[in-house]
Amino acid sequence: MKELDLHGISHYDVKDVVENFILMNDTPFRIITGYSERMRNLTKNILDKHKFKHHTSAHNAGEIIITN
């Protein structure tokens, strides 16, 4: 499963990084947001905007699984 790790990416840059990744890759994939609530919310908002189905990993709250 492809993976995007957002550790080290600023909140300012997350929109461009996540959009590039989700539009260039086939699902399923995962995005590692870490435990920053702001980073998780920014990422989920982008996924919702593009109508991707997603859920938080049952094993890691800092990981979003995209299944669309």
Label for each model-derived stretch:
Residues 1-68:
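Long, charged, low-complexity intrinsically disordered regions
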